[in-house]
Regions:
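Receiver (REC) domain active-site loop signature in two-component systems and cognate sites
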Residues: 97
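Charged docking surfaces used in two-component/phosphorelay signaling
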Residues: 44-52, 64
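Short amphipathic alpha-helix used as the core "switch/output" element in two-component signaling
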Residues: 68, 103-116
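Short hydrophobic/Thr-rich beta-strand motif most characteristic of the beta2 strand and flanking loop
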Residues: 54-61, 69-70
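Alpha4 helix (beta4-alpha4-beta5 surface) of REC/receiver domains from two-component response regulators
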Residues: 104, 126-146, 150, 154-157
Length: 161
């Protein structure tokens, strides 16, 4: 998919229009968006959009990398007498990734008391009712199709407290 996207869609077509995504994303001070996607194209688009939304973020390349980073952020928060919600505003994850997929990442987050209340948005090129049902079954707070910046911005705003 990655190679096809790069062939059929020049990189300048993947520019995020600030007018379409809207105003700054309001995150709690000191928090970030933790994002996971193995696709270079998708990571680039997510980074562009989060920059336009003025949202601090950390980007990872797999569910496992995101899970490890999330646990490290939680440990750092706990060492300061805080919770992970003082460090991470939400997790944005792809579904199909090496090492750990987005379903497993989401399930791990939602089943852990340590991450209670942490919103998870699944951002995927996979569609269809079976995937959307599975997204709900693992407890994701939102689902949005890839490559539509304004839909992602709207979904992030909807799930943020």
């Amino acid at each position: 998919v990655e190679a096809i996207l790069q062939m059929v869609s020049p990189s300048d077509e993947h520019q995020v229009d600030p007018q379409k995504v809207g105003a700054k994303l309001l995150l709690r001070p000191g928090t970030i968006v933790l994002a996971a996607d193995d696709s270079f194209v998708a990571r680039s688009l997510i980074e562009q959009e989060l920059k336009v939304l003025q949202a601090p973020y950390e980007m990872t390349k797999s569910g496992k990398e995101a899970w490890d980073r999330l646990n490290a952020l939680a440990a750092a928060a706990e060492a300061e007498g805080k919770t992970v919600l003082d460090k991470v505003a939400l997790v944005l994850t792809d579904l199909e990734m090496p090492e750990m997929d987005g379903f497993t990442l989401t399930r791990n987050i939602k089943q852990s008391a340590r991450f209670s209340g942490l919103p998870v948005v699944i951002h995927s090129s996979l569609s269809g009712s079976a995937n959307e049902d599975h997204v709900r079954s693992v407890g994701a707070d939102g689902y949005v199709a890839k490559f539509v910046a304004e839909d992602l911005a709207q979904t992030l705003r909807q799930v943020l407290p």
